[in-house]
């Protein structure tokens, strides 16, 4: 975990080339919209205690800002850049500093592919209440798209598949995937790439329905059993 912490302590996405920022923002937008739909059923449960596990600098803060949410990340650098001033904790997902059966919902976006995911899932299960929900997003091992900017990391990085989450203690209640943009488009000048992305978005949604779990990012909702 030290190499993961060190990597994200030096994480400076604003220095990335424009095409990478465009693709990352597009991926985040697709993920955000998908999870927003999953969270709609909890709209009347504002007293839910939620953990955003691996919150980074708060890219997905708007998903959980209306809940009673704690934001956790291993990188102090990222947490310092998170605009929220409170309810932030710097900690390791493999050793979560919470009592058993604490949370109603855990959100874990693009984290498990960088750690011992089974150990992390065991920790998350420990802190979830009975029948508590877990929503995860990971880089998909079974993706039809192999976009290198989401795979070529300088740290441990293991894409995961839906089968990796068929484990004791959790039941999968929903799965889908997003991001089917062909890699060839990234050679386009940024101004053209931004237009391509704009027109591709409805296409991506259609492909997500046709190729349910074959997109670049796998989204899974699980319940603690």
From Swiss-Prot:
GO terms for molecular function: methyltransferase activity; S-adenosylmethionine-dependent methyltransferase activity. InterPro entries: Methyltransf_11, SAM-dependent_MTases_sf. SUPFAM superfamilies: S-adenosyl-L-methionine-dependent methyltransferases. This is Uncharacterized protein MJ0638. It comes from Methanocaldococcus jannaschii (strain ATCC 43067 / DSM 2661 / JAL-1 / JCM 10045 / NBRC 100440).
